[in-house]
């Protein structure tokens, strides 16, 4: 058959836009095309890089086809295109023209995202392929309405050279005659089909194709934009002459002088221009960092690995990248360490049989490219569950299984035999002696073990590793604040058991304090952990942040927590450039040794498939860097080799870090803690300002949550930061009861004491107060009814402000000493001179048991107390003035108990639980001092009674709030004294 038989000239006229797939016949080269080659059971040392190619010697349509090569079995080659809109439920047909150098089969595939943006289906069909051009197709029915689909083709264990052309997606069960997405298409690419470059002059290629029967004089209008820095510039219009059924590539010498992820978009006359994106980074200085002396940024797992199928690992060529190129990109983003999860079950799949893949190859390539490996040991040995792939592994089968873990996954704790554990440590440390110095002992053991259960494993690992390699560094504890993990409590208990004697460094995962806007700011949590180390004489141990996949502001996390859909985990994993940079700066300026926060999958930019909400490690398409990688590039450029002088807080509500060069000049990064609060900065002559990616900006401007870099001398003197407004209304809260009142929380943001007059519109009267610098005051205004929002007028006599804020809804209110009847019985809360007294009577039918770490899952009473309910009204999240108490009656496993949140001393509380059958009465008296109060005052509280039968909580009945009480203090009701 003639290789050109399916030319456009022989096809009927098409309806423009009928085929949603861009560059579907590859006349625009490799623009938009993504390929991945998985090399099964073949590691990085034996890497075979098979790249996608455009072949102009054979085509089914036009002049070009896509050529994929898979020369041997044991591999997989995947080809994918940008996502397309498929908004309707129903049938869709994917078709394409294919031929191969030998008969075989290929897998057509369509990834479809459902309407909720989370659920996705993978539909596939194997079809035969011959040595002649043949049109193949597959039809699938999608029941759920969804926004997008991604066409894929996979060569799976079928060695061949394959040519592809004329890809089309049709609605319905029939493949319509092939037609491109538009009569004219245009796109851009970089010479060499690169996805990222170092700043400077490069060849930008403009591709244009005319699929019509008419000659065209096209005008291509391009613009370059970068979202994080609001950068945009227009390129001069370009004229392109095209004959019928022809394509052309025009090279342009272009200066890429703006750091960031540059998006090229625009228009082409009579057609469609497909957007493209490229990462532009600065070439970093060749500064060699010493992990024993210098702060280093790292990440989790190699950037070219993905688990493939149940029993295999596979190294992947991402589009045109080799492993070295992938690591070059990570090094360009400032990464110098990799936390490598050495999976025991892969390392020793059978007793005494040590596998060399992928561990040997991965570690070898890291050392070759200048990445310090940090090997994490013990992941497979911590837990197991029925049906898990490690259930029949020899280590698990001869280990002792304990109670369930503290995760809601159905897993149980696994206690590996100590002899097996020591042998594994010896095997790994000995094998990589001279290559790997750093070893972390178990991932987040506080979710699986009690301190007394973990410390023996740590001790054994430390002693065994030191015997195998005295020069190795053992990183211990690795506690997490995620999944309600009691990070501080676990570290403290480990300290009591002498754990720090078996650590050369201590790691933690600060999920409970991701940034400085949290209720417990990130820097405060670091100091808390350091205080625990000092308590046990271990203050000289280096402290590492070895994982933090989720880095969000308080506002972002609040929004994410409100999302009940499965999309929540995807929102968690989407990390912005400013948040990653802020965490690096916080960690270094507050004395951490290293920070290895994100995972390799988070370094992908999903530009071509933004709505395909699947895990990043399953969504490699092109090697475009994520924006936070450009921010990491700037971080290294500004800080590597510099002396960190510590944190710098120019003004309340700001945060920063400051550094010193060897010549005495300084570098600083400063930002606003909350994204809704802005400041103004002004740098004196000689001080330069740079944006988050290191582009120079004006020396005067607005300071937001995106850090601004400053370079110059004596920055604390030559840089001014001021609030954009003197006062902030942090929030307005409605208070019910006999008298309805609104509380208005006003903050003086300036560095001077201010006299402020406050007047809410539509409310009688106005009030004044003197507010010290950077302090707040709460104004209480009686109202006849509550509005949804109020406009507040503020004045210091010189300047007037108008601020509109929504009202935090009213909750229940009760007077001190009044008895409240409830579905479970009754309660009374009384503000006594010596403290706050609770008396709760509960009717119960059956006593339920619970785990000691989760008292809320058993029969019992839960108290929520906010001793300052009308201040800090910008944050509903818990703060240091919110307390929790759990009172549980006796069960078959536990005596009657009382436990509290970490900020409340349980020993100061007088309490008693009286039982009568299954019914019980709990009485508690909490001293005012314990609640950080000097005397009785109005406060907020809630009471939830938990009902459990056997080992499962049946219900939880709150008085005022709901199931969000554990994280939202605005749910609590009010206790009034009058």
Give names to the regions the model predicted.
Residues 782-978:
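Structural preference for beta-rich elements and adjacent junctions enriched in aromatics
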Residues 327-332, 337-406, 420, 424-429, ...:
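Aromatic-lined substrate-binding rim segments of carbohydrate-active enzymes
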Residues 203-210, 214-216, 648-685, 692, ...:
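Carbohydrate-binding surface patches
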């Amino acid at each position: 058959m003639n290789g050109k038989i399916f030319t456009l000239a022989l096809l009927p006229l098409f309806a423009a836009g009928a085929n949603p797939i861009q560059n579907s016949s590859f006349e625009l080269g490799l623009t938009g095309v993504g390929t991945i080659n998985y090399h099964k059971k073949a590691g990085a040392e034996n890497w075979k890089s098979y790249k996608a190619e455009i072949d102009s010697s054979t085509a089914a349509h036009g002049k070009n086809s896509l050529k994929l090569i898979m020369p041997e079995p044991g591999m997989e080659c995947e080809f994918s295109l940008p996502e397309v809109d498929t908004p309707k439920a129903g049938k869709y047909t994917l078709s394409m023209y294919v031929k191969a150098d030998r008969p075989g089969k290929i897998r057509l595939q369509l990834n479809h995202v459902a309407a909720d943006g989370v659920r996705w289906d993978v539909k596939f069909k194997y079809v035969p392929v011959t040595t002649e051009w043949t049109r193949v197709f597959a039809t699938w029915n999608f029941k759920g309405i969804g926004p997008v689909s991604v066409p894929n083709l996979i060569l799976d264990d079928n060695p061949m050279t394959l040519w592809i052309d004329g890809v089309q997606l049709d609605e319905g069960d029939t493949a319509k005659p092939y037609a491109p997405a538009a009569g004219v298409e245009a796109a851009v690419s970089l010479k060499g089909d690169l996805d990222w470059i170092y700043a400077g002059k490069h060849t930008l290629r403009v591709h244009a194709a005319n699929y019509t029967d008419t000659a065209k004089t096209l005008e291509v209008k391009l613009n370059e934009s970068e979202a994080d820095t609001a950068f945009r510039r227009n390129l001069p219009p370009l004229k392109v002459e095209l004959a019928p059924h022809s394509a052309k590539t025009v090279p342009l010498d272009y200066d890429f002088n703006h750091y960031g992820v540059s998006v090229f978009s625009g228009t082409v006359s009579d057609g469609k221009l497909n957007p493209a994106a490229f990462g532009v980074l600065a070439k970093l200085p060749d500064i060699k960092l010493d992990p024993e002396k210098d702060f280093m940024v790292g990440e989790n797992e190699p950037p070219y690995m993905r688990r493939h199928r149940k029993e295999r690992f596979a190294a992947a060529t991402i589009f045109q990248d080799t492993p070295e190129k992938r690591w070059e990109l990570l090094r360009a983003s400032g990464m110098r360490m990799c936390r490598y999860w050495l999976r025991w079950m892969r390392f020793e799949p059978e007793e005494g049989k040590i596998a060399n893949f992928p561990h040997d190859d991965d570690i070898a390539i890291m050392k070759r490219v200048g990445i310090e490996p940090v090997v994490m040991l013990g992941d497979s040995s911590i837990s197991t569950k029925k049906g898990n792939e490690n259930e029949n592994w020899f280590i698990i089968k001869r280990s002792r299984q304990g109670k369930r873990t503290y995760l809601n996954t159905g897993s149980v704790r696994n206690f590996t035999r100590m002899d097996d554990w020591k042998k594994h440590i010896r095997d790994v440390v000995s094998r990589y002696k001279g290559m790997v110095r750093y070893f972390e002992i178990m991932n987040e053991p506080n979710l699986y073990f009690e301190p007394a259960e973990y410390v023996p494993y740590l001790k054994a690992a430390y002693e065994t590793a030191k015997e195998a390699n005295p020069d190795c560094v053992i990183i211990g504890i690795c506690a997490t604040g995620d999944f309600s993990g009691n990070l501080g409590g676990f570290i403290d208990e480990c300290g009591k058991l002498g754990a720090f004697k078996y650590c050369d460094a201590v790691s933690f995962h600060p999920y409970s304090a991701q940034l400085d806007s949290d209720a417990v700011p990130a820097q405060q949590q670091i100091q808390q952990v350091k205080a625990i180390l000092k308590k046990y004489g271990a203050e000289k141990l280096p402290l590492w942040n070895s994982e933090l996949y989720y880095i969000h502001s308080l506002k972002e996390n609040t929004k994410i927590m409100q999302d009940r859909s499965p999309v929540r985990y995807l929102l968690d994993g989407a990390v912005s450039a400013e948040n990653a940079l802020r965490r690096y700066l916080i960690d270094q300026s507050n004395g951490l040794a290293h920070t290895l926060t994100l995972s390799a999958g988070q370094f992908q930019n999903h530009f071509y498939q933004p709505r395909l909400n699947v895990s990043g490690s399953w969504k490699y398409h092109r090697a475009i860097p994520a924006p936070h990688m450009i921010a990491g590039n700037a971080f290294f450029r500004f800080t590597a080799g510099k002396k960190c002088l510590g944190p710098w807080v120019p003004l309340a509500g700001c945060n920063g870090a400051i550094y010193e060069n060897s010549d005495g000049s300084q570098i600083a990064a400063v930002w606003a803690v909350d994204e809704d609060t802005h400041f103004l900065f002004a740098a004196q002559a000689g001080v330069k300002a740079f944006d988050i990616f290191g582009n120079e900006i004006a020396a005067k401007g607005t300071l937001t949550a995106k850090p601004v870099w400053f370079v110059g001398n004596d920055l604390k003197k030559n840089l001014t930061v001021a609030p954009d407004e003197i006062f902030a209304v942090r929030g307005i809260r409605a208070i019910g009861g006999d008298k309805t009142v609104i509380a208005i929380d006003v903050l003086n943001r300036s560095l001077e004491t201010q006299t402020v007059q406050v007047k809410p519109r539509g409310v009688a009267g106005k009030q004044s107060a003197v507010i010290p610098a950077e302090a707040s005051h709460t104004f209480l205004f009686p109202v006849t009814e509550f509005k949804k929002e109020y406009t507040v007028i503020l004045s210091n006599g010189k300047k007037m402000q108008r601020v509109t804020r929504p009202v935090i809804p009213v909750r229940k209110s009760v007077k001190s000493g009044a008895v409240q009847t409830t579905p479970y019985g009754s309660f009374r809360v009384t503000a006594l001179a010596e403290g706050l007294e609770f008396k709760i009577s509960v009717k119960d039918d059956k006593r339920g048991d619970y785990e000691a770490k989760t008292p809320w899952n058993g029969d019992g009473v839960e108290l929520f107390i906010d001793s300052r309910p009308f201040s800090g009204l910008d944050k509903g999240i818990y703060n240091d003035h919110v307390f929790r108490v759990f009172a549980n009656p006796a069960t078959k496993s536990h005596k009657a108990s009382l436990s509290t949140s970490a900020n409340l001393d349980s020993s100061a509380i007088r309490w008693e639980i009286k039982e009568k059958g299954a019914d019980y009465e709990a009485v508690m008296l909490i001293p005012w001092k314990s609640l950080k109060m000097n005397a009785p005052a109005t406060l907020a509280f809630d009471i939830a009674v938990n009902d459990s039968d056997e080992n499962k909580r049946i219900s939880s009945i709150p008085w005022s709030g709901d199931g969000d009480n554990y994280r939202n203090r605005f749910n609590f009701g009010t206790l009034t004294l009058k």
